């Protein structure tokens, strides 16, 4: 009797197992991921109950006390322990306390390349309770000046290799802004912070300078192009920094991992997910000044790297490298990032071995994140029942002719069906707030949708088209608005158009992105109308864009038109131009290509077009 009962129970459990695998194949993946999220939530609540407000800086100081001799940063072969980073950041804090009027709450802009001093200065300023604004190290002239003016800093700290960029705009900076250079010898008008460090104390900074009163207080400004206009300073709260720093842990990284970071630290991926993630874990990172496809695997083997951060373009570059022996002979087990296309994903795994690719999605300033913890190729994550407990989002219909969300006769938005691309929007509430941008409320309000499904509701507009399949996996489709991504960076079309508009022979410039086979994102293209009685100066145009814009923002293709179509609200139409691309056989208008060897734009011939399509000409 007992035997038959046990046999029946076993058969029943086995049947349930197969039924679960058939009907709910991702249940346990989702469930264990949920437990991780709940565990972290409980930890945060315990801090609150004890009256503690723990920040990423607090966690770093805790690790420093527990493991002072452990390597925190490895850079160009040099090892910086947790204690080393703590002491140098103390020196920076004391030097600024003794030689400036900086105080708690002041904004300090940071213009530095990837190097240990980026972290030293960041943490040193955090110990003073300052808000740190990360500036894109590629920016120059008006773009750089715009970002500095936007965040209204009291001071700017500049890396030794970028002093030339700040020197160019020094006369235009507000008089009260003090500029510090991380170099002994600095240009006139800039103070040497490096010079002050030798005499500065490395003793701990009194906690009273940085103890926070609320996790919603501003910690950082990180610049983002979003979907419209010039770069905006996204307000990053202490809470957002904490959330960003748990990404590596949520994907399964541990304190024993060695994490390879080549992404720029001025981006949230490099700073919050990368450096912040190492702090959360108490792990070690290998920091690189720039990504090198030829050096990547050598570094991974040399430093016993187990985890690396990526953007899709990075993985594509690695796949394009010449094959060599022992490509699967490494210790890398996880890769965390975003923007990885399905074809590169498959190619990467086939060539470099069983690495778990942890794709994620999230805007710097956004209030929603997707994390693909199942390894489903091409997906950014899965929206299941458990996920809906934490994030409320919808995919809504979009009117491409009016360039705005579609609304019915009653004024309400409507959701798309599964399999259809729709605009991703996320509910703004106490659980998932949107902190907006520095400066005018206009920028903040422009990212919000009001009265979407009912009177009074508010949603964050991501500006991204996504779709959801029958298994509830979510996929990125395309980006809307006045930006596109190229070389892993957001390009603001209005900024590029403004630079072109300063040329005396251009009447109107319409900037957009076009897809190029073999490349992630979209390459920049501009369609222009010439002023009456003015001729096109291709060399002058080339010089204008390369001196005023970062390399990734320079238009690679140029189209000359007689007239441009506009929408009912007088916005320039882009959709048809994007679809037509840059094929000289399909477009009768004159086309040109940016030739860096000739330092000019040259006619885009059928031969050049074919060389681009076959990747003989590299972009």
From Swiss-Prot:
Binding site for AMP: 221-232
GO-annotated cellular components: endoplasmic reticulum; sarcolemma
Main location: membrane
Transmembrane spans: 22-42, 119-139
Compartments (UniProt record): Cell membrane, Sarcolemma; Cell membrane
PROSITE patterns on file: AMP_BINDING
Membrane topology annotation: Multi-pass membrane protein
GO molecular-function term, one example from the UniProt record: very long-chain fatty acid-CoA ligase activity
Pfam families assigned to the protein according to its UniProt record, in alphabetical order: AMP-binding, AMP-binding_C
Gene Ontology biological process terms, A to Z: lipid transport; long-chain fatty acid metabolic process
InterPro entries recorded: AMP-bd_C (IPR025110), AMP-bd_C_sf (IPR045851), AMP-binding_CS (IPR020845), AMP-dep_synth/lig_dom (IPR000873), ANL_N_sf (IPR042099)
EC numbers: 6.2.1.15, 6.2.1.3, 6.2.1.-
Keywords: Cell membrane, Fatty acid metabolism, Ligase, Lipid metabolism, Lipid transport, Membrane, Nucleotide-binding, Transmembrane, Transmembrane helix, Transport
Keyword Cell wall biogenesis/degradation included in the entry's annotation: no
Catalyzed reactions: a fatty acid(in) = a fatty acid(out); hexadecanoate(out) = hexadecanoate(in); (9Z,12Z)-octadecadienoate(out) = (9Z,12Z)-octadecadienoate(in); (9Z)-octadecenoate(out) = (9Z)-octadecenoate(in)
Protein's job: Mediates the import of long-chain fatty acids (LCFA) into the cell by facilitating their transport at the plasma membrane. Also functions as an acyl-CoA ligase catalyzing the ATP-dependent formation of fatty acyl-CoA using LCFA and very-long-chain fatty acids (VLCFA) as substrates. Plays a pivotal role in regulating available LCFA substrates from exogenous sources in tissues undergoing high levels of beta-oxidation such as the heart.
Family: Belongs to the ATP-dependent AMP-binding enzyme family.
Name recorded for this polypeptide: Long-chain fatty acid transport protein 6
Organism whose genome encodes this protein: Mus musculus (Mouse)
């Amino acid at each position: 009797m007992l035997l038959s009962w046990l046999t029946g129970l076993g058969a029943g459990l086995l049947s349930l197992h197969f039924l679960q695998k058939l009907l709910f194949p991702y249940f346990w993946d989702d469930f264990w991921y949920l437990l991780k999220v709940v565990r972290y939530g409980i930890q945060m609540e315990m801090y609150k109950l004890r009256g503690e407000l723990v920040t990423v800086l607090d966690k770093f100081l805790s690790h420093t006390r527990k493991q002072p001799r452990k390597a925190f940063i490895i850079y160009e072969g040099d090892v910086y322990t947790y204690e080393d980073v703590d002491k140098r950041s103390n020196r920076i804090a004391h030097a600024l306390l003794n030689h400036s009027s900086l105080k708690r709450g002041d904004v300090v802009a940071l213009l530095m390349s990837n190097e240990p001093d980026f972290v030293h200065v960041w943490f040193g300023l955090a110990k003073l309770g300052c808000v740190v604004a990360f500036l894109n190290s590629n920016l120059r002239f008006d773009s750089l000046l715009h970002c500095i003016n936007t965040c209204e800093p009291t001071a700017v700290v500049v890396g030794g290799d970028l002093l030339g960029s700040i020197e160019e705009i020094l006369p235009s900076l507000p008089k009260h802004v003090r500029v510090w250079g991380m170099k002994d010898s600095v240009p006139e008008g800039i103070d040497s912070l490096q010079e002050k460090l030798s005499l500065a104390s490395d003793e701990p900074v009194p906690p009273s300078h940085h103890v926070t009163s609320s996790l919603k207080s501003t910690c950082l400004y990180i610049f983002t192009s979003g979907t419209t206009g010039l770069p905006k300073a996204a307000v990053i709260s202490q809470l957002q920094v904490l959330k960003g720093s748990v990404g590596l842990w949520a994907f399964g990284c541990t304190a024993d991992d060695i994490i390879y970071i080549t992404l720029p630290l001025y981006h949230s991926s490099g700073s919050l997910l990368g450096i912040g993630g190492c702090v959360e874990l108490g792990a070690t990172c290998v920091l690189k000044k720039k990504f090198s496809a030829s050096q990547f695997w050598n570094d991974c083997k040399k430093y016993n790297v187990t985890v690396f951060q990526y953007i899709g373009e990075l993985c594509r570059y690695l796949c394009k490298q010449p094959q060599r022996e022992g490509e699967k002979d490494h210790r890398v087990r996880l890769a965390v990032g975003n923007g990885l296309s399905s074809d590169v994903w498959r190619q990467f795994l086939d060539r470099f071995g069983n690495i778990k690719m942890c794709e994620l999605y999230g805007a710097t300033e956004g209030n929603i994140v997707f994390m693909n913890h199942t390894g489903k190729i091409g997906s950014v994550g899965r929206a299941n029942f458990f996920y809906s407990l934490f994030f409320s989002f919808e995919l809504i219909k979009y009117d491409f002719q009016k360039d705005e969300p579609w609304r019915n006769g009653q004024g309400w938005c409507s959701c798309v069906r599964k399999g259809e691309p729709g605009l991703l929007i996320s509910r703004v509430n106490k659980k998932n707030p949107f902190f907006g941008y520095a400066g005018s409320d206009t920028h903040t309000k422009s990212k919000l949708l009001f009265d979407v499904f009912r009177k009074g509701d508010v949603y964050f507009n991501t500006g991204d088209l996504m779709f959801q399949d029958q298994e509830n996996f979510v996929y990125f489709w395309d980006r809307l608005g006045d930006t596109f991504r190229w070389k892993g960076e957001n390009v603001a079309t209005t900024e590029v158009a403004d630079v072109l508009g300063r040329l005396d022979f251009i009447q109107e410039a319409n900037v957009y992105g076009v897809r190029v086979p073999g490349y992630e994102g979209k390459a920049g293209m501009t369609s222009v109308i010439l002023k009456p009685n003015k001729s096109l100066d291709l060399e002058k145009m080339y010089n204008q864009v390369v001196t005023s814009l970062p390399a990734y923002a320079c238009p690679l293709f140029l189209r000359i038109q007689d007239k441009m179509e506009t929408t009912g609200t007088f916005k320039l139409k882009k959709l048809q131009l994007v679809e037509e691309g840059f094929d000289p056989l399909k477009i009768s208008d004159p086309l040109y290509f940016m030739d860096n060897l000739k330092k000019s734009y040259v006619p885009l011939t059928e031969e050049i077009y074919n060389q681009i399509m076959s990747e003989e000409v590299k972009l």
